[in-house]
Amino acid sequence: MSISKAIEKVEARYAHQPEFIQAVKEVAITIKPLYDAHPEYDKLKVFERLVEPDRVFGFRVNWEDDNGEIQINRGWRVQFSNALGPYKGGLRFHPTVNQSVLKFLGFEQIFKNALTGLPIGGGKGGSDFDPKGKTDSEIRRFCYAFMRELHHYVNKDMDVPAGDIGVGGREVSYMFAMYKNLTRESTGVITGKGVGFGGSLMRTEATGYGAVYFLQNMLAAQNESIEGKKVLVSGAGNVSLHAAEKATLIGAIVLTVSDSKGTIYDAKGLNQEKIDWLKVQKDQHKPLADYVEVFGGEWMADQKPWSIKADIAIPSATQNEINEEDAKLLVDNGVKYIVEGANMPLTAEAIDYIRLHRVHYAPGKAANAGGVAVSALEMSQNSVRQYQTFEQVDERLQGIMKDIHDSSAQASEMYGQTDEGYIDYMSGANMVGFKRVADALVAFGILN
């Protein structure tokens, strides 16, 4: 079956899952030159197999709030592909979570994980539980209840979840404690743990730092440096603040961070003191707008960062945060590089627009793979009961991000997607990730 026919089949079968369809189409369109060059992929229906998860688990999560009321949420775990290793992907707690969102994230995770070159498959999970406004006791009770259900489907050799939006170190700790209580095993079943009980140094920083390392390689490919470049960052969570931190440390001028209520614009640029203040502010769930009272700058209520002149954008908030109108603003304001810190933060129309205007674009599956790369290193450390230093992990991370950049650029050129120095990282990354998984599926026959 041709790629176009496969897309039609997905659209018909999952018409009610727009995020998933968007992710599938983005990969399908860009891998066509590779797919056409390998008839064995079509013969064994590799693409059709990859768009269907191995399995999807759904479950009810009952928990008790501080008023003694029983609350009910939905939970899911999507085990998409274990062709390259155990299922690996985060858990997201957010009211927008549904099967479509988790399937899009799990599908992307297959190729992101493949790009790292590490032996991990792709999966994703989460719940429509909203941590905002909940007390620590309520979050703890929910995490315990969630893991009571999830523990049936995960273990260190089959499926290893991690954190994502709404799931940080606190939530991972609660879930890990419940897993140990239920199974009487202390294993590497979940990553993002505290360093004192099996976690890896640098896991917190990895996604944001990794995105900036990828950006450095993009700039170097164009004979440019990050020094003095003006950067727009969206979001104010873990990825956003660590991307801002690393960019600042190596000489960029980070002008913005944002949340759902608006954007901080600091024309002087962030520094370490300001970033440390922002980390505390977000950890304590206090308003981002307070920044202006402490450090000055401008609070742009109900606005995104994209109307500000800059060289680089790192969207790190959530999926589809940049639409076509935002993309036009970015181009009009001089942005030449876009690096996705979040998963699929650009709509399909926005991607088409920036590529048409030759903006250098790094898709999330390549640019934000640093988080899962260090998660895999945590799994390795757990298996041999040894820790690596921050410097050792950072060196590995820089090497992994360089390899992802270089392999994506080489694939772009090999399949005719590079034009007068403009590297099509989206096509390149999709082809590299897809080929690694597809070759494994061909080797396995029809059993995987």
UniProtKB/Swiss-Prot annotation:
One of its GO terms (cellular component) is cytosol. PROSITE patterns: GLFV_DEHYDROGENASE (PS00074). The keyword Plastid does not apply. It is an enzyme of class 1 (oxidoreductase). One of its GO terms (molecular function) is glutamate dehydrogenase (NADP+) activity. Gene3D superfamilies: Glutamate Dehydrogenase, chain A, domain 3 (1.10.285.10), Leucine Dehydrogenase, chain A, domain 1 (3.40.50.10860), NAD(P)-binding Rossmann-like Domain (3.40.50.720). The active site is at K124. One of its GO terms (biological process) is glutamate biosynthetic process. The record marks D164 as: Important for catalysis. Keywords: NADP, Oxidoreductase. NADP(+) binds at T207, N238. Homohexamer. NCBIfam families: PRK09414.1. Catalyzes the reversible oxidative deamination of glutamate to alpha-ketoglutarate and ammonia. This is NADP-specific glutamate dehydrogenase. It comes from Psychrobacter sp. (strain TAD1). The gene is gdhA.
